[in-house]
């Protein structure tokens, strides 16, 4: 999902259009099919949560239409991964009784960007949950979510909150069987 609030600057809209054109060039190869959605979001609801919901809902609908369960993977435009990322996710689902999970992540540590305090805060959050004895410790980064499409539909999909949507979504599924 390539998205921007409806009242975005012309520069942002042009950047999105260029991204859309680039993705069209790589879509539908023999190994992967990509459905691209380029959409303006209502200003009041615009945010990564709504974009994530649109993408997940569309992918789940596509799998249902094919009468096939598939793997949904969240990934943000500013993320990076290695060449084996998708294969590792596929193998995890193939080799385990997996319905959903949180993928490992690591931000590139640029000393100038302030990412170190952010990364430490993320770790502090899960360490605090662990220390408190919370039964289901998990990170709440939306870009790290993966879920089986049938499981996604069964549990009502992503919500439309403008902030914290990944937190609330994960809390619905984290205690269900097959979460890793």
Model-predicted segments: where are they?
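Catalytic donor-sugar/metal-binding loop of nucleotide-sugar-dependent glycosyltransferases
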Residues: 161, 173-180
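Acidic donor-binding segment of Leloir-type glycosyltransferases
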Residues: 1-44
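Conserved donor NDP-sugar-binding/catalytic core segment of glycosyltransferases
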Residues: 84-117
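Acidic donor-binding loop at a coil-to-helix junction in glycosyltransferase catalytic cores
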Residues: 161-168
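Acidic donor-binding/catalytic loop of UDP-sugar-dependent glycosyltransferases
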Residues: 66-69, 75-92
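A recurrent flexible, glycine/aromatic-enriched loop bordering the glycosyltransferase active site
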Residues: 126-146
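Glycine-rich, basic loop-to-helix element that forms the pyrophosphate-binding segment
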Residues: 41-64
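Alpha-helix termini
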Residues: 24-30, 58-69, 176
């Amino acid at each position: 999902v390539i998205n921007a609030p409806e009242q975005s600057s012309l520069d942002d809209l042009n950047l999105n259009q260029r991204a859309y054109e680039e993705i069209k060039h790589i879509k539908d190869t023999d190994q992967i099919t990509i459905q691209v959605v380029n959409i303006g979001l209502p200003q009041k609801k615009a945010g990564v949560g709504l974009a994530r919901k649109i993408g997940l809902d569309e992918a789940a609908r596509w799998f249902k239409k094919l009468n096939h369960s598939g793997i949904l993977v969240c990934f943000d435009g500013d993320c990076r991964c290695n060449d084996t990322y998708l294969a590792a996710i596929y193998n995890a689902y193939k080799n385990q009784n997996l319905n959903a999970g949180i993928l490992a992540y690591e931000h590139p540590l640029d000393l100038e960007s302030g990412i170190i305090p952010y990364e430490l805060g993320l770790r502090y959050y899960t360490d605090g949950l662990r220390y408190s004895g919370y039964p289901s410790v998990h990170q709440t980064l939306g870009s790290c979510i993966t879920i089986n499409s049938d499981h996604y539909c069964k549990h009502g999909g992503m919500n439309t909150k403008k902030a914290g949507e990944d937190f609330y979504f994960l809390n619905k599924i984290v205690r269900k069987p097959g979460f890793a």
